[in-house]
Amino acid sequence: MADLFSKVNDFQKYRTNLGRQGGLTVKLVGVRSTVVVLVPSTKDHRLRWKLIRLLTLAVYNDSLPDSISIGALLSLLAISFEQPAAVIRGLLSDPDLEVQMIEVSLDDQGEIRFAARGDILTRYKDAYFEKIRDFPNPDDDLAIFEDPELGDYSDITQDEYQAMITTITIQLWILLTKAVTAPDTAHDSEQRRFIKYLQQRKAYAAFKFTTIFTERVRRKIAQSLSIRKFMVSIMLEVRKSGSAKGRISECIADVSAYIEEAGLSGFILTLKYGIGTRFPVLALNAFQSDLSVIRNLIDLYKSMGTIAPFMVLIEDATQVKFAPGNYSLLWSFAMGVGTALDHAMNNLNINRDYLEPSYFRLGQEVVRLSESTVDRSMAQELGIDPTSEDLIMRAVQAAGVGSRDPDAARRTGRFQVADIQIDEGPVDLATEAEDQTTKDNEQRIKVPDPRGSIGQSNAQFQPPKPQLRGRVMPPERKPTDQQKNLQDQRPRPSATPRRLTKDAEDNIDQLFAQYDSGVAAPEDVTLVTSDSTSPARSSGTGSDMDLINQSP
């Protein structure tokens, strides 16, 4: 059996790396798209500022074809360096693009012109500029910078240009952080990071882009794989620079820390919380298969080299192997541990189809029960004796770490998975109320099967009465026999009230007059109604009042 287990591990490792060995038999390249890239011919900051204004218009205009908008974005990413043309030639090795690079300069009037001469390029330049400035809305060219006067500002100094190009570069690279992985929540995180650079005096609010411009640039970055590959190549090249980095390179290296391993949070968090915590529960047989998968993925990640942290951004097909669904049990356990330990896990969406609720709760329970435990290997390495270990346990309990921490309890409660028990029998609300009270609302609520029993139609199904959360509705009260008798004896008006005749009304007036004057009422008063043929005999004590009550 030991040999079989070894062969299974080798086979899984072979499957993980299958197809990555060997060379190409034939070069598979699709039809390339031609893009126009404008680069400055000199280091003049006035030329570069005018070119930046032109390129931002080209990126902002959604009506332009990709050959112009993608080329303008490539130029905008490279213009922050001293030699933009060399950067594009050396780092843009995309098999899907064919770059047509054109150098630009300033003419005698201070306007941009193509450095190369010829009637064809002159006509091409006029058509290029005309397309860029052709906006569906004439006011769109003022919506790039938050300062509307910045678009018409031409007399820029060298110091202002350095502040401007640094701010623009930071904003463009920040857009890459969540352009692919989380575009819906990208705006808030981008604002937080930009505020950080404002506080560090690396960026300046005077050159801040508008929200609509950043949304359009983010959308172009997400749509164009060539743009993302070019940005990843720049980040990898900046890493190789070591400590000899310029201001722009340092800003790119700083932003790249947020971009690395984007889309690989499931794999990284599994290593951190599932394995890095070293809980003894990893010895369960159920975890052994997932642990073997993790071993092979670690080897695969290392074999990919420096491109591995960016595999999701460049859409490498290997990224599918790192999906948490391939090691769902271990990932579910790691998410339970992470939500119980780390406050930052509150913003992580773990509601996935492959989440195993039982192993998720196992991770939370392990954290609760292991709040005072110590890793033996680490304790031996640090030379911790039993006295020090007891001191550590008391300190942990006094600090409220683990289940004693109210924040931890609130975090774990946020991720509770509800269990609903289905029962086909009817529900007795009175009995259920007693169970809820005596067991402190821990009894599961039983509801009947909506489909009904066999042979019973859905129309005959009567749903139970609704229950409020945390308490049970009181049972319906039925009237007692005494209350029913009182209700039956209560006088009810007749369906057809009887009308009094004129003579009866006169007799009633006389009767009230005698009462008011204190004269004794006659013993008998004859009242004749309109719906009776015989007079009604009534005494003057109370029967006549009942008759009055019957009249409208």
From Swiss-Prot:
Record region (Disordered): 423-552
Coarse class of the protein's main subcellular location: virion
InterPro entries xref list: Paramyx_ncap (IPR002021)
Subcellular localization, as worded in the UniProt entry: Virion; Host cytoplasm
Keyword list, A-Z: Capsid protein, Helical capsid protein, Host cytoplasm, Ribonucleoprotein, RNA-binding, Viral nucleoprotein, Virion
Annotated region described as Ncore, given as residue ranges: 1-402
Extent of Basic and acidic residues compositional bias: 436-449, 474-491
Binding site for RNA: K178, R193, Y258, R352
Composition-biased stretches (Acidic residues): 423-435
Biased composition (Polar residues): 527-552
Gene Ontology cellular-component annotations: helical viral capsid; host cell cytoplasm; ribonucleoprotein complex; viral nucleocapsid
Molecular function via GO: RNA binding; structural molecule activity
Residue ranges of the region described as Ntail: 403-552
Domain remarks: Ncore is globular and carries the regions required for self-assembly and RNA-binding. Ntail is an intrinsically disordered monomeric domain in the C-terminus.
Function: Forms the helical nucleocapsid (NC), protecting the genome from nucleases. The encapsidated genomic RNA serves as template for transcription and replication; encapsidation by N is coupled to RNA synthesis. Forms the encapsidation complex with the phosphoprotein protein P. Before encapsidation, the newly synthesized free N protein, so-called N0, is chaperoned by P.
Family membership: Belongs to the paramyxoviruses nucleocapsid family.
Subunit relationships: Homomultimer; forms the nucleocapsid. Binds to the viral genomic RNA. N0 interacts with the phosphoprotein (via N-terminus); this interaction allows P to chaperon N0 to avoid N polymerization before encapsidation. Interacts as N-RNA template with the phosphoprotein (via C-terminus); this interaction positions the polymerase on the template.
Name of this protein: Nucleoprotein
Organism field: Tupaia paramyxovirus
Gene: N
